[in-house]
């Protein structure tokens, strides 16, 4: 298999390929990047500190990335939060707490760029790196919000994260999806793989065409509703919890008794006997299957059957 390390900054792309659109007042940068082995499903990892991410599946084999800066600049408080978070991540990596995959990728990037000078972008700071069918996409969004619009082959797996000022939207993707937001909604439609979706302030809305068999999934938020639509024939064990909301479904969910999650007996030492019952409501759909977990604090849960 051919191995490649593909590293781009927008300035470099401009010099060699001419595929960048640039507006001084409202920058917009674009890059088209192939996977090392386009015959196999790839993986895209993208992160934005301030802004949103939209990913759409299409019939092509390359990843098309566009970064669009918003006209409204961020407040000084937003900038300080983003800078502090980035510094914390870099400090953790410097202390050797990065996962092995990150360390390996960092070593490969360093070797490839040995003796070369990094040219920083003066636009959205769009950076795309590709190693062994894994593509990493990031932007500089400290002083103004930047939105990422990405087109990927249908079977691409995704790992996406955002923090402020934007939603994450995914359409027509069949790979595995892990998506995290902090202040924004998650909106997934036409997906047909495994989904792990989490946000803090925002709704989680997912519409499945089909689900991967025997794979667990999780959907969670703190302030918001969870609304997930599944094919009618899914088989699953479901665990559902809403502290300050209700749970609704048009599936025939067979509820199960919730066993104690903890039993503690300290009576011999003069203490107490304590039983703690789990807060989740559990049940099965169509006889049961992999575990699907739904968890919100301030919001309702809707588990829908596709019509």
Identify what each model region corresponds to.
Residues 161-201:
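Right-handed parallel beta-helix
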Residues 1-9:
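Bacterial N-terminal signal peptides that target proteins for export
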Residues 70, 166, 184, 202, ...:
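Hydrophobic lipid-interacting interfaces of membrane-associated proteins
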Residues 158, 168, 205-206, 226-228, ...:
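Beta-strand-rich extracellular passenger or scaffold domains
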Residues 8-18:
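Bacterial N-terminal signal peptides
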Residues 21-47, 52-161, 172, 178, ...:
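Acidic (Asp/Glu) and glycine-rich low-complexity loops/linkers
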Residues 297-307:
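C-terminal/domain-terminus segments
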Residues 193, 198-199, 208-238:
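Flexible, glycine-rich surface segments
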């Amino acid at each position: 298999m051919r191995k490649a390390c593909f590293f781009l900054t927008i300035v470099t792309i401009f010099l060699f390929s001419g595929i960048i659109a640039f507006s001084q007042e409202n920058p917009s940068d674009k890059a088209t990047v192939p996977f090392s082995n386009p015959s196999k499903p790839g993986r895209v990892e993208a992160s934005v500190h301030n802004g949103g991410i939209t990913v759409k599946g299409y019939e092509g084999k390359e990843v098309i990335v566009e970064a669009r800066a918003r006209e409204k600049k961020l407040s000084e408080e937003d900038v300080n939060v983003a800078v502090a978070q980035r510094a914390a991540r870099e400090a953790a990596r410097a202390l050797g707490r990065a996962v092995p995959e990150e360390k390996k990728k960092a070593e490969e990037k360093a070797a490839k760029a040995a003796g070369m000078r990094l040219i920083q972008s003066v636009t959205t700071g769009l950076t795309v790196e590709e190693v062994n069918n894994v593509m990493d996409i990031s932007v500089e969004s400290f002083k103004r919000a930047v939105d990422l619009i990405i087109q990927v082959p249908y079977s691409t797996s995704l790992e996406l994260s955002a923090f402020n000022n934007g939603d994450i939207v995914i359409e027509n993707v069949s790979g595995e999806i892990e998506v995290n937001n902090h202040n924004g909604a998650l909106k997934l439609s036409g997906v047909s793989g495994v989904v792990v979706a989490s946000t803090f302030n925002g709704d989680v809305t997912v519409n499945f065409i089909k689900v991967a068999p025997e794979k667990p999934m999780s959907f969670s938020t703190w302030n918001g509703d969870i609304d997930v639509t599944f094919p009618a024939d899914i088989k699953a064990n479901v665990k559902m919890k809403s502290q300050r909301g209700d749970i609704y479904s048009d599936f025939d969910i067979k509820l199960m008794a919730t066993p104690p999650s903890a039993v503690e007996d300290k009576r011999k030492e003069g203490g107490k006997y304590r039983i703690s019952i789990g807060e989740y409501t559990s049940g099965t759909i169509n006889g049961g299957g992999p575990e699907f977990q739904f968890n919100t604090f301030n919001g309702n849960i809707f588990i829908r059957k596709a019509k």
